[in-house]
């Protein structure tokens, strides 16, 4: 497994783009993905979750994930990455837990969730406070639709996975080998 840690330089990343294969990676941002055309496979840990038009996937901070596209047709999605601090009252959940099943099907999603996502995607200027408000609308509507489990329950027992997860979650802390 080739894994990368992506340092998110921008406070907010929001774009609609053609979906493609993205190798396993992790970052300390909350990632929201909404399929707008075609299909997308979102891999979290060792599980692969199929997503269709209108489905929304959530990757909480410091969770190894990847994307795959198997369809021959063009697939597009809205991708939003924000610091977990943007989650407001949901911040502790974003940092300490992960969705057991990270995809919410289109039929379960209220229209204001799509409106909030589109508002973020269509912003001409980066307005963090406005983005934060929209992210909290999305979370308020969606987080109750997901069963949350401790992050240690998501992923793999594989030594490499566990090592990378530990290092990524603790690399800023001081430590000693004494």
Mark where each language-model region is.
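Regular secondary-structure segments
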Residues: 36, 114-125, 164, 168-171
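Residue-level recognition of alpha-helical structural elements
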Residues: 109, 123-131, 152, 156, ...
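A short, Lys/Arg-enriched amphipathic alpha-helix from helix-turn-helix/homeodomain DNA-binding modules
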Residues: 151-177
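Generic protein-terminus/edge-of-domain signal
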Residues: 1-56, 71
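Amphipathic alpha-helical recognition patches that constitute DNA-binding helices
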Residues: 31, 108, 130, 162, ...
